[in-house]
């Protein structure tokens, strides 16, 4: 009997250790079409819903906005644990509704895009358990690291990452949205290089 109890305890511990985390980063900078186009916001919300629906009981979803480093609203990070009571459908509904509401919100746009800072300083990615970091962003870093126009024109690249994201899937939904193909290629190449140096597996979704 004791042996059975021990086996069950170890099994539960193993399952807990393998729980994945889905971190959803929402770009509130003014260049992101998410803030101005309802159709884009809807498509982004549907993609997020699909990813949430892949999760299992015990997995974690955390949501955080980013843009300007001095904006207090970016400090909040609502966190949900998938369970029998809190199913993926409910979590997806809450987050989807928020994303779709963004184009209707006034004065929400922030003047800069600190995407690198978000990736390097946000805690809880849980990359050791093959988790995912899903960014809803046009991927135009516009910060003290590099100006947006410099990046888009290929005049200056992204700095070397100061973070270990080995084991994480890093997905950018909306990379280069609304920009010409040449700019999209530059952004994709830069973020692919940055992600590889950080140890992450990078995917760009260009709707």
Regions found by a protein language model. Give the residues of each.
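Hydrophobic h-region of N-terminal signal peptides that target proteins for export
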Residues: 9-18
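VWA/integrin I-like adhesion module and closely mimicked acidic/polar interface patches used
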Residues: 140-189
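Von Willebrand factor
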Residues: 19-129, 132-134
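Hydrophobic beta-strand segments of well-ordered beta-sheets in folded domains
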Residues: 19-24, 58-63, 131-134, 162-176, ...
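Acidic/histidine-rich, surface-exposed loop or edge segments in extracytoplasmic proteins
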Residues: 20-35, 97-104, 168-176
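P/S/T/G-enriched low-complexity
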Residues: 18-26, 174-207
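Positively charged n-region of N-terminal signal peptides that target proteins for export
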Residues: 1-4
